[in-house]
């Protein structure tokens, strides 16, 4: 591992995070006032709906990093190049099926939301969804290159690229909004920048990393191993969608776009909160995979878990206390008094969410050791309970009901069950 790459990558992760959150804090209230509460709710509902297509990745993203890192550490170049070819084929097929599923969703939008949305609102929703579907289908085969870059432990380039996109995107989106293109223009610009970013990553892989893509031999034994590994990542992805996207769908169906907008503001703060923990945790999967390949001791891996966990604990508790003290007043000034319920909704999730956010490196360790199956099974059961609890609670308490169901689920899944598992398996 290049220590300089890792250290600079960590610094850039937090620079990127700071800039992203700062831009969002400045940009979100402007956007709310330019497109209105209802259209903001429509945009977030579309994001949640199409976001479900992201699970069509089937967990192969983590598999790219894990197995490419393994072949790099073993200096198996031919296997690495054929692995790249295999993933290109897999992701192209997934992109095609994503397009088909997306079109099915698009066709059924009127049936799902005609009772709680006006004709104009449905038109905006369908246009946004159509754009997002095509972007999702294209992003699958292009997305492999960002995973390859991480496998080579080149942390600086993707972080710098991310910082640039975070600066450019809101500027162009703002120009689009003030010229009257609304949420549709906002989505179009995000898609264009996303595709350009993926193309730049692809060029970096070929020109700088000198990777090759070969289709000479499809290794069915490694494919079987990858599918088994990825399946439980896929289950975890479904769980994440149930946790973080289903509430908007339920509220959109039961309460309409305005309630979705309020809940989305609360979700924005949850995203900020999560990002401070996950900013560097994604960098550890290739590192831990190579440590295991070289037969480093469990004690060394456990020390990484504890060290990073302590740092994350200090960061997360500092942020949480700050939000408890000033969050309510900030939301009313920042977004408007009509969003004041977002404070209590956010806290119902943020407080229990602190538990898993100080243990994010643990997931990388479980994946590297192929011990992530148990976590996926537990989370799936808890997520289903959360889903069925959210519906009646949403009818009683709107957004607060959904947040309460999510918070209780996190306490059971992460606070009780997974803590016990980490104690037994990662110590």
Where are these regions (language model features)?
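Membrane-interface junctions at transmembrane-helix termini in multi-pass inner-membrane proteins
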Residues: 3, 7, 136-164, 184, ...
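Interhelical loop/hinge segments that connect adjacent transmembrane helices in multipass membrane
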Residues: 1-6, 123, 184, 201-244, ...
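Interfacial/gating helices of multi-pass transporter permease domains
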Residues: 31-54, 183-188, 222-229, 251-271, ...
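Interfacial segments at transmembrane-helix termini and the short loops linking adjacent helices
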Residues: 107-131, 323-354, 400
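Signature of the first transmembrane helix
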Residues: 5-70, 98-103, 135, 170, ...
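Helix-loop junctions and terminal segments of transmembrane helices
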Residues: 58-74, 151, 209-210, 266, ...
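Transmembrane helical elements of multi-pass membrane transporters/channels
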Residues: 9-24, 189-201, 205, 220-290, ...
């Amino acid at each position: 591992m290049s220590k300089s790459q890792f250290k600079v990558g960590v610094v850039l992760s937090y620079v990127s995070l700071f800039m992203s959150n700062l831009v969002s804090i400045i940009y979100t209230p402007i956007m709310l006032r330019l497109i209105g509460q209802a259209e903001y709710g429509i945009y977030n509902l579309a994001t949640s709906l199409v976001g479900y297509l992201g699970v069509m990745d089937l967990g192969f993203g983590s598999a790219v990093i894990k197995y490419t890192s393994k072949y790099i550490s073993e200096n198996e170049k031919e296997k690495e190049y054929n692995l790249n070819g295999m993933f290109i084929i897999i992701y192209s097929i997934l992109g095609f099926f994503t397009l088909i599923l997306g079109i099915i969703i698009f066709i059924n939008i009127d049936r799902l939301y005609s009772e709680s949305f006006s004709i104009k609102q449905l038109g905006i929703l369908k246009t946004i969804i159509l754009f997002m579907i095509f972007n999702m289908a294209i992003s699958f085969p292009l997305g492999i290159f960002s995973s390859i870059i991480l496998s080579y432990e080149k942390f600086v380039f993707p972080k710098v690229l991310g910082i640039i996109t975070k600066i450019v995107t809101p500027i162009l989106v703002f120009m689009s909004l003030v010229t009257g293109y609304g949420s549709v223009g906002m989505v179009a610009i995000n898609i264009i920048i996303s595709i350009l970013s993926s193309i730049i990553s692809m060029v970096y892989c070929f020109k700088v990393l000198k990777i090759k893509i070969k289709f000479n031999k499809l290794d069915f034994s490694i494919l079987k191993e990858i599918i088994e590994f990825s399946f439980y990542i896929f289950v975890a992805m479904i769980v994440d969608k149930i946790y973080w996207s289903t509430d908007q769908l339920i509220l959109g169906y039961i309460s309409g776009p305005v309630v979705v907008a309020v809940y989305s503001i609360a979700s924005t703060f949850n995203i900020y909160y999560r990002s401070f923990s996950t900013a560097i945790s994604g960098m550890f999967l290739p590192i831990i995979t190579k440590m295991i390949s070289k037969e480093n001791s469990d004690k060394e891996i456990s020390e990484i878990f504890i060290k990073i966990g302590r740092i994350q604990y200090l960061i997360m508790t500092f942020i949480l206390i700050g939000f408890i003290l000033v969050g309510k007043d900030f939301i009313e000034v920042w977004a408007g008094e009509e969003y004041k319920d977002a404070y209590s909704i956010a806290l119902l999730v943020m407080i229990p969410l602190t538990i898993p956010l100080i243990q994010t490196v643990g997931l990388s360790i479980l994946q590297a050791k192929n011990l992530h199956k148990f976590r996926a099974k537990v989370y799936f059961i808890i997520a289903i309970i959360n889903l069925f609890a959210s519906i009646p609670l949403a009818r009683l308490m709107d957004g607060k009901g959904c947040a309460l169901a999510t918070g209780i689920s996190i306490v059971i899944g992460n606070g009780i069950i997974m803590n016990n598992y980490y104690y037994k398996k990662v110590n």
